[in-house]
Structures are given as C-alpha cells and as structure tokens.
Amino acid sequence: MKYFLLLLFFILAPRVVDAEVTVVINSEKFVFLGNPRLTDVLTPVAQKRHWYWPSSALFRLDGVNAEQQRREVLTSLVIIEQESDVALANSVQHLKQQVQAWQLADRVEQTIDFDLARLDPNFNPRFEDGHYLLLLKERPTTIEVFGLTANPTTLSQQHKMCLARQLHKTYSELENKDLIYLIQADSTITTSGIAYWNKNCGDVMPGSQIYLPFFESQFSDTNRKLNYAIARLAKNRVIQ
C-alpha cells in the first residue's frame, strides 16, 4: 500500500518543466535548457567573424508589441492621407507601403557585446523563457533612408556625415525641410537638423536608419507624436 501511495504521489504531483530558450543567431538555431546568460548565447559564434557589436540586435519572436504599434501607425496614416492634399497624400501612401512591408519583431533593449558581457555582470543578463532572434553583423557600410518619399534608399556610411547636404541633394522635395529622425543602430532615437543653413556634420553609426518625417508645428504636437511613433516602430525592423 505504501508503494502504491508513493507511485500515486509521483503521478499526480505537478511536474517541473525545464525552461527552454530558443535563439536563432542569424540563420542558425540554438536551444538552451534553463535560462542562459548572454555570454552563453554568444560563445558558440563570438569568434567566428569580426562582429560589429554596436549594430547587433536582439528580438523576441513571440512578442506582439511591434505588430500592435504597426497597426496604430497605419491607422494614423490612413487618417492623415484622407485629410491631406494630393501631393502629401501620395507621400503618405508611399510611407504606408513601406511600413506594411517591414519585417518586424519586438526588439529587446539590451546591449549586445561579448567582451563587455564577460567583464561586467550588468551587461550579461539571463534570457527569459521564449523565442529570440539575434542578428550579428560585420561592420555595415550603409544607412537606410525611409519616410515620406517614393524613393527609400541607402546612403554610404561615412565619417562625419553631413546629412543636410546629402539629403537635400538626394531629395529635392522634403515634407520637413528642417529635421530628420535618426534611429541609430543601437536603437537610440534622436533628431538632426537639416535646414540649408545647418552645416553641422556628425557621426552616424553604421547600420542606422534615417526617417524623413512629417512637418512639425510649434502650435500642435500631433505630427511630432506620430513622427516619434514611426521612429520607435522602426527600431523593431528586422534588417538582415
């Protein structure tokens, strides 16, 4: 009877299921039992190539936030398109098509750097249960440009890029002639002045994105909020 009760206990007792973390590193899949640290995930690939760590990006493949943000942005764009003149409506249509075509996943705000993670425990967190995509790249040579334009393009990345000169040369008509949004490769969002009188040149991280935004009025923050929402959404782009 005692053995029967023990057997019954083991059958009915809740089972502890080992945590499982799946990480696709570029195109190679790794499965970890338990919750690995960043160094555990990077060790199999860290020395394979000369990775440019600042442009590395970690995404959750089982997240839903990015797609929700996309729906909200597209809804706002439809409203603006309906209320705009023909020229702006056409530009909005092009932006909608760009946003609809993006491959998105929820970006994890985490610095990816193998050497830093080995030296500083604060940069070597454990992965929560789930499915991830980790993109590692050698040093990119281009900057992606998207936004209110029929011609999204790429610019060659250079030291001390003079964005005002390059963008006005590439795009004769800009909805916002004063500033652009810069989504750095490390997911930091900033604005940069591009007025004709702006002669400032600065460093743009390889693999960054430039968003050509709506005009922003000092009397209303509607466009500013939408511009930031689009830039924030672009952080979640999966750019192979």
Give each language-model segment a name.
Residues 17-240:
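Ser/Thr/Pro/Gly-biased, low-complexity, turn-/loop-rich segments
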Residues 4-12:
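Sec-dependent N-terminal signal peptides
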